[in-house]
Amino acid sequence: MLFLALAFASCHRGERQTLRSALQMAYADPDSALAMLHTIDRRSLPPEEKAYYALTYYLAQDKSGLDVANDSLIRIAYNYYAKHPKDSLYARCMYYMGVYYSLSDSLERANYCLDVAAQEAQVQKDTATLCLVWSKNSWVVRKTNAPLGLKYASQALAVYRKYSQATPLNTIYYILLKGECERLCGKSQEALSGSKEAERIALALGDSVTLSNVYQDMSCFAAGAHDAKAVH
């Protein structure tokens, strides 16, 4: 019996380490993180690890650009973390619950979850999650309330610039998001000027896909600036 108990504990330690590695990997290489998660039988996990698994899987799917409109996974995470608001992953869970609701057109619920996520991220000094929340808020409201969208996008970019673990790719994303909001506010020239920084970063990265996305946005900003000049 002792041998079986030790073997069981050792198995769970191994799965726990795999989960921790998968969460870290999900940000930079989500496809590999998903492959790693597929090696774990989540049915045998204790509640805490099952919630961790569900959140990590949902996060990796989102980063991979896969459909995350199904709430079965994030709901498992939410049901656990809602009872453990002091957990370091509570803010991130509330963020992804907000993402789910925004995809389901439940904007009132989405706003509630995102507000809670922002508050908890500030308490926990979780800069990455805070910037994600503000960028999602910006994306949700930008077409109905462009000035508010610009406010959120500007906050996200300003805070992310100071983040010690900021990545060039995410910095580009926040610059372009701010630019899109500026365009919607009739400030296409400012958007075009700001996007030149994104172009420099993308050129330094040597990522053709990212550079193509930057040029596509710059073209849109340039067209808006040209139209504005034609009006005046």
Which residues fall in each region the model found?
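A "functional boundary" signal
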Residues: 3-232
